[in-house]
Amino acid sequence: MISHIPNSGGNNSLMKHDVVQGNNIVDLDLLRNFNGVPGLNRDNFIYISNIFLNIKQRNEKNHTINMFREVSISNDTISVKFYRNEKIECACNFLMDKDAQGYIDLSDMNLTSCHFKGDVISKVSFLSSNLQHVTFECKEIGYCNFTTATVDNVIFRCRRLHNVIFIKASGECVDFSKNILDTVDFSRSQLTHSNFRECQIRNSNFDHCYLYASHFTRAEFLSDKEISFIKSNLTAVMFDHVRISTGNFKDCITERVELTIDYSD
C-alpha cells in the first residue's frame, strides 16, 4: 500500500506527470493504488488529480467515456471520488491547508470536471483556479472567493450564494439560474453567454463587467441599495421581464440590449 507521495521539489515536481507520459492502463492502475490511502494532503491531491486528468484528456474525443470528480468538503478535509463511466476508480480524503483568511485553500488548482456536493460550502478559496465543466450542487455557498478564476460552463445548483467574490473571474456559459445572489461581487468579471434567469439579486455589484449575451430573464433586483452596472459592457444582454427598484447603468455599453420591466419604483 502506498502511504505517501514523495514531495521533494514542491508542487512543480508533482506536476511533471503529464499527458505525454504513460498510458491509460498504467495510469488507471496507478490511480486505483491510491484508493483509501490515509494521510493525503494538498500536494497529493494535485498529483492524483493530474493522473486522473491525463486519462480524461486522452479520452476526450471518445464521448462514450464520462469522467468526473465528486467532491465534498468538511472542515479542513475534502473527500474526492474519481469516477470513470459511473464507476468509482479511486476515493480519497485530503487534509487541506487554510489561507491567511482562514479559507480552505483550493487556489491555483485545475478543478476541471469537479462536482461539488454538500449542504453548505463555506469559506473556500478558489482564487485563480481553473473551474471548467464544474457543478456546485448544494443548499448554500457562502464566503467563498472566485477572484480571477476561470469559470467556463460552471453550474450553480444552489438555493443561495452570499458574500461570494467573483472579481475578475472569466468564463462563458455560467449558470446561476433560480439562485438567490445576496452580496455577490461580480465587478470586473467577464461572464459571457451566462444565465441569471429568475435570480433574486440583492446588494450585488456588476460594475465594469463584460456580460455579452447573458440573460437576466425574470430576475428580481431586490437591494437595499441600487444595483450597479457602472461602465459595464451589456451588449446583447436580455433584461426581459425583470423587477428592479433602483439601478445604476452609467457609462454602460448597451448595444442590442433588450429591457422590459415588470416592476420598478
Give a label for each model feature.
Residues 1-18, 28-30:
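Non-Sec secretion/translocation targeting segments of pathogen effectors
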Residues 20-26, 30-265:
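Tandem repeat scaffolds
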